[in-house]
Amino acid sequence: METVRSAPPGDGAAEALLKELERQVQDVVRASSWWERHGVDCAILALSLLALPAGFLCLRAHNILAFATGITILGVCHYTLTVKGSHLATHSALTESKRWSKILMIFFLEVCTAFSAEFAKFNHVNLHHVYTNVVGLGDSSTWKVPLLNRYVYMFLGPLLVPIITPLVALEHLRKEEPRTALRTLGFICLGLYSQYWLFMNVSGFKNPSSALACMLLTRSLLAHPYLHVNIFQHIGLPMFSPDKKPRRIHMMTLGVLNLPRQLVLDWAFGHSLISCHVEHHLFPWLSDHMCLKVKPLVSKFLHEKQLPYNEDSYLARFQLFLSRYEEFMVHVPPITELVGVQ
């Protein structure tokens, strides 16, 4: 068991700190326009949808540069819709309407991502966010595959994500109500077949195997950073016992890490998954743009209150995981106990 010796504030002080930070963030949100709160991210998602025809048409050209451009457009747009769009929709961060939030969640998760909306929301919002880095609940253990060695997992494993995603969804459908399962299955099939149809009829592929290969290629374009980001920002940080989990502000500041800004990943994954992950875990209802806007405030507040604000580079985390792969991804993590908090 690991012990944090410099004890953070106790329960009462922790609640007061969180309320003070929430008040400051709410003041920023109230002073922000609709464009800042939702419009910027909605515009990015809309542009990604509008760019899809150009990507499919580029693949018609018998030119390697045009083909590469088409694959890049389709790949980046795919991840923008399936990662950024799905993530924001799951947190109802794209609109304040409950009805539209539900519609957008189904569209981005089931049609675009080929995954179950209900299953994703339960695992991400109800488990991962509520029990961040709590062993057996929100500890990101679903990303661990102990059977794979470090090189296979870090370099080849990501290529399996587009194949595994719909298979996991189909496996889960057996536990859903028949009506929900049929809806999810229908939308997953619609999304996959629509992309296949577009490759065959708009891009002009002559045989199904070529279309399927391009589907896999575009869905794998950013699979490596997608997998890496999901493990870098939680695994290797303090883990907590379910019966001794710390107060929320300690859980989120100790167990979450920000990566530096990176143009492509910021666009495709969103600020809340890259450079503002701490802010996102503290305020999951904020859009990507709002997470970026409150980042200086949150960083300053946590530093002033002598609370952790974890930051590291992508390369540093990559090297760390390669060198300590068994410790992080195979063995049971040590439990961190905060002295003076529980």
Swiss-Prot record:
Keywords: Fatty acid biosynthesis, Fatty acid metabolism, Lipid biosynthesis, Lipid metabolism, Membrane, Oxidoreductase, Transmembrane, Transmembrane helix. It is found in: Membrane. One of its GO terms (molecular function) is oxidoreductase activity. The keyword Plastid does not apply. One of its GO terms (cellular component) is membrane. A motif (Histidine box-2) lies at residues 124-128. A motif (Histidine box-1) lies at residues 87-91. It comes from Mus musculus (Mouse). InterPro entries: FA_desaturase_dom (IPR005804), Fatty_acid_desaturase (IPR012171). Belongs to the fatty acid desaturase type 1 family. This is Fatty acid desaturase 6. The chain crosses the membrane at residues 39-59, 63-83, 100-120, 151-171, 185-205. The keyword Oxidoreductase applies. A motif (Histidine box-3) lies at residues 277-281. Its EC number is 1.14.19.-. Pathway: Lipid metabolism; fatty acid metabolism. It comes from the Eukaryota. It is an enzyme of class 1 (oxidoreductase).
